[in-house]
Amino acid sequence: MVAQHVNESSIEVRPMSVHIGAEISGVDLSHPLDPAAVADIWAALLRWKVVFFRGQELDHAAHVSMARQFGTPTPGHVVFGGHQEYPEIYSIAKHRTANSTKTPPTIRPWTGWHTDITAAINPPRQSILRSDVVPPYGGDTQWVNL
């Protein structure tokens, strides 16, 4: 599939499949975005439902700052809360509860299809996932347009 420039910003959108997913390049998410870039990213998200930004160096502060350019972030998780300093962030790391319990974390194999945080009365309209550690192979996150 062919990458395309969108509107007036310098971003490039490259579809990753026929129906869902696109990679966006030509933007540095660690700095404030101009209104044209925000509009183009939003348009790509509406069209492709899932967008990917590779090679971005974001810490928690930059992650939340970037998210605020697209709306008001919600608490990281309605039941389990979020990060102490950044309540908008909820870790989905495998061992995230290791320090909050006296017993070792339970490692369970995949237990079925699920969608994150959608049981909330007012679920977020989108989620922003950021990977701190990217395995060399074996990632199996899947996306669906419900």
Summary of predicted features, one role per range:
Residues 2-146:
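Non-heme Fe(II) oxygenase catalytic core, chiefly the N-lobe of the double-stranded beta-helix
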